[in-house]
Amino acid sequence: VTGHVVYRAVVPESEFPEDLKWNAASIWVGPNCHLVHYPLRGGKEYNVVVTFHSREQEQWGVTDGSKEEVLSYFQEICQKARQLIELPKSWRRWATADREPIETWTFGRVTLLGDAAHPTTQYMAQGACMAMEDAVTLGEALRVTDHNILKAFDIYQKARVARTARIVLSSREMGKIYHAKGVQRLVRNDLWRGRPTERFYDAMEWLYGWNVNNCLDAVKNYQGNVA
């Protein structure tokens, strides 16, 4: 358990502030916390997500949350962002978890995928995405081995270990960047200030540019290395 808590809520478009109805994922960052909001269902709803470092000893799980707890971690947030915390009528609370990347998650005729194999924090928003990539890769490995379970599992695991480990470790680092304080915060702000959007996109090409063909190619690359 990481000690990082995530609150999520959905707000109807009719109740969302007009000056914050941006057609993009928007983030407000601060020491040990951040807030994200973005449109859903073509702008009919807005997702509001807050993350903070909990003061409590957390146990993994999902429960109902309270606005009072959220506000206690965002006392010095600017008023424009604070109004977003006031909007939801109810919150869901996640105590998050990850683990050190591992090289093996296959055991005989049993293999794992998604969070069961490589749980990650939410800072890269890649938990479900990695599970889908795993599924495509595993399916292709089964196809090319004519459903030889042991060979397919071996190919699948080798094809996925490095990328999923990079996600886990990068997500941790992104959390540090979002939640920086003191001098680290000043360095972050200086690096981000005035940076063209294209530079951010280029830096994340390895992540968001990945598609089904990459999964298929990864299987092909490892297919000849499995006896």
Where in the sequence are the language-model features?
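C-terminal domain-closing interface element
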Residues: 178-197
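C-terminal auxiliary extensions adjacent to catalytic cores
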Residues: 193-227
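A non-catalytic, amphipathic alpha-helix used as a structural packing/dimerization or gating element
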Residues: 69-76, 80, 151-166, 210
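Conserved FAD-binding catalytic core of PHBH/FMO-like flavoproteins
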Residues: 1-89, 102
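Short, charge- and proline-biased low-complexity linear segments
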Residues: 23-26, 76, 169-179, 223-227
